[in-house]
Amino acid sequence: MQTVKHSAMALFLAVITFTAGAHPHSFISLKTELVTDGTQLSGLKMRWTMDEITSADLLYDAGNAKPGDEIWKKLAAEVMANVLGQHYFTEFWHNGQKVKFMNRPTEYGMSRDGHQAVLTFVLPLAHPQPLAGQTYTFSTFDPTYYVDMSYAKESDVTLPTTLHNSCKIAVHTANLSEETLNFAVSLDIEDA
C-alpha cells in the first residue's frame, strides 16, 4: 500500500440516495458529475432519467419534437419549476453545515431517451467550495418517498478526470425503517 503524503486534495463524497423499497410510485435514475475548476467545487451536473410511466405525459406532450425544439424548453421549464420548489430534491453538506444552492440552475433541458424523459441541469452552489482536504456529502431524495430517486451503480457519480488521483467518491444507499416504508406505501398522488 502506497501512502500519498503530498496529496493536495482529499475529497470523500458520500452520496446518499433514499430508496423506498416498499412501493414508490415513480422512479428516477440519477447520474451526477461534480462541476469544478480543479480547486473549487461549484456545482453538480445532474441527469435524471424518469421511468416510462412517469415519462408518458411528458413524451406525449413532446410528440415527435426534435432535440432543442421549443416544446422541450417548455416542458423542461415546467419540470424545473417543480424541482426548484423542492430545493432540487437535494441536500449538500460540508462540516455538518448545509451548503446553499443558487435559486436557479445555470442551465437545464429535457430530452427523450427511447421511452423515457430525461431532465438535465446544473445545480450551482451559492458559493464555490474548496476541494483540498475537504469532505462533502450530498443526498438526492424525495422526502415523501413517493419517488424512488437512486443511482444504479457507484460509477453514476463522477469526478472530472483531472481529480481522479486526488479525490474519492462513495455512493451509499439509505436503509429505511419499516415505519418509513409503510408510510411510503400509504401515499397517494395527492400526498406527494
Segments predicted by a language model, with ranges:
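Bacterial N-terminal signal peptides that target proteins for export
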Residues: M1-M9
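N-terminal signal peptide c-region/cleavage motif recognized by signal peptidases
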Residues: T17-T19
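Early extracytoplasmic/domain-onset interaction patches
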Residues: H23-A56
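Residues that act as N-cap/strand-start positions at coil-to-secondary-structure junctions
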Residues: S26-I28, Q86, A132
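Ordered hydrophobic segments in well-structured contexts
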Residues: S29, G43-R47, E91, V118-V122, ...
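Structured domain cores in non-transmembrane regions
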Residues: E52-Q129
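Mature, soluble, non-transmembrane domains
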Residues: N95-A192
